[in-house]
């Protein structure tokens, strides 16, 4: 089973409450507003700030383009 992208319509970044985008290649949910990437483990998003990694400036720019 794969991550259900329909979830993106109802979940939000827990830090900034903004929209999340799915990075299929890295299996992460991306919040450019909070500059965080949340892992998706076994098709389950882990929306905990302490589990997220910080996005680099280059990554933020990539996702915003």
UniProtKB/Swiss-Prot annotation:
GO CC annotation, single: cytosol
Highest taxon of the lineage: Bacteria
Annotated Pfam families: Trm112p
Matching InterPro entries: Trm112-like (IPR005651)
HAMAP family: UPF0434
Family, similarity comment: Belongs to the UPF0434 family.
Protein name in the entry: UPF0434 protein PSHAa1659
């Amino acid at each position: 089973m794969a991550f259900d992208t329909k979830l993106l319509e109802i979940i939000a970044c827990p830090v900034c409450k903004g929209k999340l985008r799915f990075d299929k290649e890295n299996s992460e949910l991306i919040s450019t507003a909070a500059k965080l990437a949340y892992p998706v483990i076994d098709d389950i998003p882990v929306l905990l700030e302490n589990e997220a990694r910080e996005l680099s400036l280059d990554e933020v720019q990539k996702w915003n383009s």
